[in-house]
Amino acid sequence: MLTQTEMFEHIRRICRVTSVPIFADADTGYGGVLEAQRTIELWEEAGASVLHIEDQAMPKKCGHFTGKQLIPAEEMRQKLRAMLDARSDPDFFVVARTDAMGVTDLDDAIARLESYAAVGVDGLYVDAPRSVEQLAEISRRLKPLGLPLLFNMVRSGKSPYLTLREAYDLGFDYAICPVEPMLAMHKAVKEMMETFMREGCSTNAIADRLTPFDEFNDFIGLREFVAREKQFGS
């Protein structure tokens, strides 16, 4: 449901507070070739270092949901060509993703990525393989292309949940873990609020699981702001 502009703002805010390279989802590129070009321009401007773009038809769905539809492979190649042409930083990494596993089959997924590789992308990504055997087959057939392969570590999704070492041993070069931070936050806040209401507006029962206030303030950089206020304030 997030728009291109909303994603740009999220990426920009994250990149402002870290020097760690940011891998930012670009969904479908938010439209046709012109929107795909605008997407990479915005992602670079925001400070991201990597994006992946997928071959789903709009409106897209989570890769581990049912009901997905694909655009023709040639249409995706056109988007990729346009995006690469608009890239200003040669070190910005563009990963081509296919969602064919949830729509057609493994052979189509591999054929699509082979054709996307020919356009000049920097990495390849099959989303939602169903088994370790399929992951091994993806690696075996795509490794000869010489491009890094991405593995999506999603707990309770369509794919088997592997450790990074297990994925690496299968031939994958790097991984994303996009869902677990949200799941952890949801569980922590849910349990805190349930305890708060059950214990009469108190969190004493879970105090050992709460970050101390001073530690949190240090984490968000409050000391720096206080020092700057003292330096420049009246």
Each language-model region and where it sits:
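Alpha/beta enzyme core
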Residues: 1-153, 157-173, 177, 183, ...
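Extended, intrinsically disordered, low-complexity segments
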Residues: 182, 186-234
